[in-house]
Amino acid sequence: MLRSIEQYAMQSCKVETIFLPKNVNSFAANCFEGSRTLKTISCNPSNPTFSVMDGVLYNKDKTTLIKFPANHSTSFEIPETVTTIGFCAFISSVIENVKFPPKLKRIDGYAFAVTKLKNLTIPDTITDISGGAFASCQHLTEVKFGTGMTYISNDCFMDTRLTKVVIPENITSIGESAFSYCPNLKEVVLPSTITSLGGSCFPTNVNISFPSNAKLSLDDQQILYDLDKIVLIMCLKKSTSYIIPETVSTIRSSAFKDMTDLTKIEFRSGITLKMIESNAFYGCSKLSSIEIPNSVTSFGVRSFYNCAQIKSVFFGSKLTKISTRCFEGCTSLDTVSFTQCDSPCTIDSYAFNGCTSLRTLTLSENISSIDMYCFSNCKSLERVNIPSTLKYIGIYAFSNSLISQVTFSSPSQMVNLSKYSFSQCIHLRDIVGTPDTIKNIESNCFESTLITSFDVPISTTSIGNYAFRGCSEMTVFRIPSRCLLQTIGNYIFDGCVSLSKIECPDSDFFVIDNGALFNKDRSNLICFPPASSITFFCFSQNVKSVSSSAFYGCKSLVGIMIPDNSITTIGHSAFAYCTSLKYINIPLCVKNIDQNVFTGCNNLHCGIVVQNTSISFRYSLVTNSGLSLTSMKDCGLITCKHVNYQTPVSTSYLYVFILM
């Protein structure tokens, strides 16, 4: 029974009408995102939540207009009962003229976005217009504000064709990007009542005027500030360089965004700058000279995104936060130093992602977290020293960089090594001082690195799937005495073509037998080193299960013997890609064989003894487990098309070999 129509549910659907059944109690106005064919909406009269009048959807008492169909009409008079126009109510519609009702109080976010409104008079009754309400109305050339509003929200008139804006006395604040990307806007008149302007609220090169008693100031560089020049709001004229006065403590969001001619920012001596907000210098592609003041505590999201000419950044003692994508794409950035950082500091996701020239990274002892993708794709970064204060390294944090050595300082507070944190670091060979505090090594953590050996930290309890996948140089894997390791994921040694030995001298959870790693009572074989020289392997009757991917890629194995009354379950891909494997027997005790167990075992041509004659069991071996049809036939029945005839290896031979 349909009860809810969620956002984007009918995205780009070319429908002209829609009917809402009685039980629908939730309707997202943007469910038709990208569709401009809808002409009318109808509704079951017994629906307790919604009502329809003239093809337009309202709440039951018609106080909220929920959805105006995109292709309904070019002119519309909103009923007198309506007090609220809902989120995305008219979005992307053909409406050109609208008459507001006398009781209207609120217009929600994006209500008229991407419509064809030409001019707009906001009634005095309206007190609240939410973000983006008239964004991208590219036919809108004039707006008159009512007396009920006190603020203009973020993005409210962004990307319109307004030519002049006169802000009335009742408005005290204008949000971020409220009139940004308005290419025809040449003049803005502000009242004396304005106390707050958001970053990039107007386009550059606009003529802004305000009375002498306004709480704003404009310097000869055409930089707009608050009255005391504590907050730098925006720059109104493009130039190659600017001097920031010592009074400034905050640079507002998008203040210098996309100033592609800007090459230099100079901060006056003694400046107490604390915050550089989001997108402040976004896309300043020629900015090469900037010395961050020691007083800065935080950098906003993308504040220096794609500043491709910045070469070095030295952070000061007050730093506490570098936000998401802050320096992402700064492809000339060579040196990043946190050595003066005296306060606990976090580095958010993607902060230095794609800084392909970064060679020198110095992290201070006060860095507490490095989030996901933070230093990913830093193609010149060769060495990293992890400070003892660092508690968290996010997924992909250093992935796909050229790091050759990672050194952990002690005593470390590190608990987890996250998924993919050092994956694809194809030059990483040395991990120095791996902390004993680490409890979890997550999936793909060291995938495709060049580490030659690995000692599991004593406090580690779990290692995730594919943790060492593709570590082609690893020869030895050690679980030290008293190590707390209990859980080992699947495929952790996939592609470890040199791993010939697993060591586990004294563990409460594991034991080594015949080169393989078992659980403590030897009832479950967990994994076998892919590069082991052992060619024949015989299970003992004590073994009851083989874990998934246990023998994955063991290319030296020729024969495997499973005794009667032993193994009952073989996990998925357990013997996959054992390319030399020519013989294995499957006794009646084996009840469950998972998928892809024999995938890639191209030498299992014939002579495989399968005692279970059940058609369904054998069918599953072929269709799910990857065993070929001919493998269960006598080798004498196979035609000469097979170059190598296969002869089953006798049980007695296998037992003698293992004993030797």
Residue ranges and their predicted role:
Residues 201, 617-628:
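Short, aromatic/basic amphipathic alpha-helical patches
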Residues 1-4, 12-26, 36-55, 63, ...:
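Structural signature of tandem-repeat unit edges
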Residues 649-660:
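Cleavable C-terminal sorting propeptides in eukaryotic secreted/cell-surface proteins
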Residues 6-9, 29-31, 67, 86-89, ...:
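Consensus positions within tandem repeat domains that build extended binding/scaffold surfaces
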